[in-house]
Structure formats: C-alpha cells, structure tokens
C-alpha cells in the first residue's frame, strides 16, 4: 500500500501533501505550466527590462536578437509538451500515467539557459539596425563588428589621433546594400581630422533605423559628387577599412585598385607600395592625350618629390620609365604613345608624324640597314631590284637595341636639324661603328630582305671540301670489296659541280670611300642576273650529298656486320665436327658435338 501511495501521489518527488484527486492535480499543474510559458513568450516580445517567475530569478533583457528570440521561445513552448505529454484522451477519459517531473525547476533551468544565450548573443553577434537604443559601452564593439572579420585591422579599432589615410573606400554592408547602394566613408588628407559627414555616418549606427536611413542617404548624396583637386580617389572592389597613413596600400596588395583620376600632389607616405601606385597613376594619365598636356608639370613635380622621398630606390627604376613621357608632351603625343605601348611600330609612327621630312633616295647594297640607322624616314632602294619605283620605301624592322639607341639619339634633335646633323661625317662614322658592333653578320641580314631581292648564300669553304675528300678516302679503306666500293671510287659523284664550275656568287667588294665616312659610300654588290641566283638556290635544294654519304656509311657498316657473322658461322660449323682433347676431362657429361660458348 505504501508503494502504491507513493506512486500515485508522487511523495518521493514532491514534499507537499498528496492530493486526493491526483488526476485533477496533475492536469491543473500542466495547465499552469502552459499558461506560464505563454505568459513568458508574451513578455519576451515586450520591451520590459525583466520578468520575475514566481519570485525566483529574472528572465532576459529586452535587447536581444529577434531571430534567436523566436527560436528560443519556440523551444520553450515545445518543452512542456515533451516533458508532460497530455493528449485529450488522457486528460478527459482513459488511464492516467503519473509524470515524475518538476515543472517549476525545469522552468527555472530554462530561464537561466535563456539568459546565457541572450548574453552570448549580445557579445558575439553583429548588432542589427532594427534594435532600439543600445548601451554606450557596446558601441565601439559594434562599430568594429561593422567590418567583416578578415578586413579588420588593429589600426581601425584604435586610432588616437582620429586621422585617416588619403584614400576613399567603399564600406559594403548588408543593410546599406539593400537601402542606398553604397555607403562611402569620406577620407581627406592625412593631416586633416575626420570630416563632419563621416562623423555623422559613424554616429548613425547608434540611432533608430529611420534616422539612420535618412542620414545615410544624405551622406551618400554628399559624397557622390565630383572629386576635389589634390585628392586621389581610389575605389576598391572589396571592403578596405580606413587606416593611418603608415598603413597605406602595402599591407593589402590583393585588393584590386582602379584609379579614376589623378592630379594630386606628392603622396603622404614614403613606402615603396605608394610609389608603385603613383607610378601606375602616372602611366594611366600620360597615356591619355587629352590629359597629357595639362598634367605634365604636375607629373614632373610628382616625380621629383618621389625621388626625394623614396630612400631605398626600389621603385625609381619604374618611375624613370615614365619620365620621357612627361618630357615629350609638347614635342609629340604620338611618339610617346607608340614608345610606351609597343616598340615594333615606332618606324610607322615616325613616318606619320613627319611626312614632309624626306630626303632623296640613298643607294644601299645590304638592304639599307645603315641608312635606316641614320634616320627611319630615309628611303632606301636596292640596285638589284629594278622593278621598285622611286616612291617605294624599303624599310626593315630593326632589333630592339638599335631602335632604343636610335630613339635616344633622335630625342635631343629638333625636327628642323635632325637630318642635317645626321648627314655630317662625324655622325655617320659613329653610326657605322655602332652598326659594326651590334648588327648581325652579312648572311643573316641578307635573309631578312623581301622575296624580290636576290638572296646571298654562303659559298662552300674549300676547307670543307678537303675534309670531305679525306673522310671519303678514309671510309673507303674499311669497306669490303663490293659494288659499294666501286660506287664510292667515283669521286665526281660527291661534287655537284666540277672544280671551277661553281657559279659566281658575286660577293660585295667594299669601296675605298667607305673608310672616309661619307653617307654615299655604301658597299655595292657586283651585278649579276636573277637566273644565277635561282640556279644556286635550286642547287642548294637538290644537293643531297651529305644524306647519300650518311646512307653509304650505314650500309657499309651493315655489310661488315653481315660478313663477320657469316665468317663466324662457317668457323662454328668447322669446329663442330672436331673433338677437342682438353674438353673430355672436365666435361665428360657433355655429348659429342656440344661445346661451351668459349670455344666459339
């Protein structure tokens, strides 16, 4: 009986007096738990500071995340059903199974867990704009949480002087993308404090959402105007937080930077990354011909200030590449643009810029390479090609070194006296020495000519012919007596032409006046017809003497191998019939006729 009483009334769990009607007692307690939790969920949505449950412990505070509040409320609303499952059949009619649970203690435990979750929510997660008035102690933390974790720098959180670097960045926010597109944080020079509009944009985080939306739109309208003079406006594709002047762009080189305009003064920091950044700015501005004339003095000043500021000289080499562009803005824009982009089309750009500066035709024997070194506009005409008209310009692409040297020499000359200065004997002699040091050999230069111009081919050296005859005589000694030796005995087969019957190649003979340095004294080749040239090319294509000689050597080697194998086979057959006396002692088990491989 005692066990039944304890089971029905729950004396072991509740210290109170057992009720006479246990069904009514438990159903009332479950209904109280339901009403209790519904009251808690209603109180959680109201902005009340705290709620007391039965005088035990306070629940949660009002500023909590709305998403997590609903989730927690739904969990608490579902918890009593899991603890006390009371279907309608068991409430009204049916058997009753006593539930050994303490609803009051369970509610207290849930309230404690709820408070811990709310504290973790306010400290770890990002503050939403839909919340009301926030505490003043948590404002710096929420401002630091405004940036993504991977973009937060220590300079962003602690800035004692309140100054920012000289760049404008776009702060991407989830809420600002939906409302007003982009929210720009304005940044002035490194010596100026934070502007009023930026301060208002920072204070807008602690206000209600409507005021923040209105002020955010005004700040975006103020910053979307034209940039002022003396500023570099850099728009970064990823979020780049504002920082001190010593941070600059060097610590985050992975962010792609797009320069929109640059008429600025010297940069505020002295790091090499800023120098390279200004180098790209100078290059982009100088490539635009409309901005080139206006920003030339400023670019020159900027280059001078950068030379003074950069101590290590890491980026001076790249900045010097843009120096001729700033110097030649008034002389010619086309020359600067073609020199910057590609060196291959420099001759065409010179032809377009100076069409009226053309001198009479200069005769050139080896395709006029010396005349082109003197001036790219001088017309050249080959004496062997009579089909070309005097108006044609025979110009060949020069190597990169000769073009750079030519541009350096032509840079100091004006358009009026460049040809007169180059026509002096001193200048032409210098050019001849330069060509002798840097030009390829004669046969290489001749191959660059056009198909209409005859091609000079190197004549076979008599030393090579002597080596061929010696090698053939040496190989004939090793050949067996066969038809191959008879074929090689005819030495005339190895020479395509008999001795003295080779066509005249017409090598150029230098004149005596070329030593004096006159521009007209150019080497002239001896006159010869095109038939001889094409006959020589045909002879070169059809001459397969080396190939035939190689095949003969291979065949002779194979013949020697076959003959030696045949001799060994004959010797083996002869030895097989004989019996050697010294093999019978150690090899008595071997049958007659089977011998070891050493006897072969």
Curated annotation (Swiss-Prot):
InterPro entries: Brme1. The keyword Phosphoprotein applies. GO terms for cellular component: chromosome; site of double-strand break. The modification Phosphoserine is found at residues 79, 191-192, 195. It is found in: Chromosome. The lineage of its organism: Eukaryota, Metazoa, Chordata, Craniata, Vertebrata. This is Break repair meiotic recombinase recruitment factor 1. Residues 143-154, 199-215, 330-344 have a biased composition (Basic and acidic residues). Meiotic recombination factor component of recombination bridges involved in meiotic double-strand break repair. Modulates the localization of recombinases DMC1:RAD51 to meiotic double-strand break (DSB) sites through the interaction with and stabilization of the BRCA2:HSF2BP complex during meiotic recombination. Indispensable for the DSB repair, homologous synapsis, and crossover formation that are needed for progression past metaphase I, is essential for spermatogenesis and male fertility. The gene is Brme1. Residues 475-600 are annotated as: Required for interaction with HSF2BP. It comes from the Eukaryota. Residues 1-98, 117-239, 315-394, 432-451 are annotated as: Disordered. Disruption phenotype: Male mutants are infertile. They have smaller-than-normal testes with reduced diameters of seminiferous tubules and sperm density. Female mutants exhibit normal fertility with no apparent defect in adult ovaries. They show a strong reduction of the follicle pool. Keywords: Chromosome, Meiosis, Phosphoprotein. Residues 1-150 are annotated as: Required for nuclear location. Interacts with HSF2BP (via N-terminus) and BRCA2; the interaction with HSF2BP is direct and allows the formation of a ternary complex. The complex BRME1:HSF2BP:BRCA2 interacts with SPATA22, MEIOB and RAD51. Expressed in testis. Pfam families: Brme1. One of its GO terms (biological process) is male meiosis I. It comes from Mus musculus (Mouse). GO terms for molecular function: damaged DNA binding.
């Amino acid at each position: 009986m005692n066990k039944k009483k304890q089971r029905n009334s729950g004396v072991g769990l509740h210290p109170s007096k057992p009720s006479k009607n246990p069904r009514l007692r438990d159903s009332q307690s479950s209904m109280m738990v339901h009403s209790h939790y519904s009251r808690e969920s209603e109180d959680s949505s109201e902005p009340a500071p705290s709620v007391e449950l039965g005088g035990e412990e306070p629940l949660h505070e009002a500023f909590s995340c709305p998403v997590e509040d609903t989730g927690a409320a739904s969990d608490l609303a579902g918890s009593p059903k899991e603890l006390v499952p009371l279907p309608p059949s068991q409430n009204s009619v049916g058997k009753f199974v006593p539930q050994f649970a303490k609803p009051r203690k369970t509610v207290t435990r849930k309230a404690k867990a709820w408070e811990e979750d709310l504290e973790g929510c306010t400290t770890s997660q990002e503050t939403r704009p839909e919340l009301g008035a926030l505490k003043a102690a948590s404002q710096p933390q929420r401002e630091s949480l405004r940036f993504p974790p991977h973009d937060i720098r220590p300079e962003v959180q602690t800035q004692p002087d309140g100054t920012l670097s000289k760049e404008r960045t776009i702060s991407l926010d989830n809420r600002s993308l939906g409302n007003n597109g982009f929210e720009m944080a304005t940044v002035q020079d490194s010596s100026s404090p934070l502007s009023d509009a930026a301060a208002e944009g920072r204070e807008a985080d602690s206000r209600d959402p409507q005021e923040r939306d209105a002020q955010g739109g005004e700040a975006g309208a103020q910053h979307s105007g034209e940039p002022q003079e003396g500023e570099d406006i850099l728009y970064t594709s990823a979020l780049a937080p504002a920082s001190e002047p010593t941070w600059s762009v060097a610590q985050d080189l992975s962010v792609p930077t797009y320069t929109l305009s640059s008429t600025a003064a010297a940069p505020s920091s002295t790091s090499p990354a800023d120098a390279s950044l200004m180098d790209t700015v100078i290059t982009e501005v100088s490539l635009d011909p409309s901005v080139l004339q206006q920003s030339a003095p400023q670019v020159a000043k900027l280059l001078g200030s950068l030379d003074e500021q950069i101590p290590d000289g890491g980026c001076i080499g790249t900045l010097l590449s843009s120096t001729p562009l700033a110097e030649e803005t008034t002389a010619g824009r086309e020359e600067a643009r073609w020199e910057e982009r590609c060196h291959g089309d420099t001759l065409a750009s010179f032809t377009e810029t100076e069409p009226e500066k053309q001198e009479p035709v200069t005769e050139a024997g080896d395709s006029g390479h010396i005349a082109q070194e003197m001036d790219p506009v001088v017309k050249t005409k080959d004496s062997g090609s009579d089909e070309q008209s005097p108006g044609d310009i025979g110009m060949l692409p020069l190597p990169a070194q000769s073009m750079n040297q030519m541009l350096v020499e032509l840079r100091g000359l004006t358009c009026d006296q460049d040809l007169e200065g180059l026509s002096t004997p001193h200048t032409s002699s210098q050019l001849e020495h330069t060509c002798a040091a840097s030009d390829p050999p004669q046969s290489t230069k001749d191959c660059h000519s056009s198909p209409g111009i005859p091609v000079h081919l190197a004549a076979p050296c008599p030393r090579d012919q002597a080596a061929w005859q010696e090698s053939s005589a040496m190989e004939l000694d090793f050949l067996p007596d066969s038809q191959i030796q008879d074929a090689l005995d005819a030495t005339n087969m190895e020479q395509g032409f008999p001795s003295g019957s080779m066509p005249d190649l017409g090598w150029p003979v230098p004149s005596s006046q070329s030593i004096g340095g006159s521009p007209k004294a150019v080497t002239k080749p001896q006159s010869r017809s095109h038939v001889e040239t094409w006959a020589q090319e045909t002879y070169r294509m059809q001459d397969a003497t080396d190939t035939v000689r190689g095949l003969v050597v291979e065949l002779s080697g194979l013949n020697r191998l076959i003959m030696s194998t045949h001799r060994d086979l004959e010797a083996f057959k002869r030895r097989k019939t004989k019996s050697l006396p010294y093999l019978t002692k150690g090899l008595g088990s071997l049958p007659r006729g089977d011998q070891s491989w050493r006897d072969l």
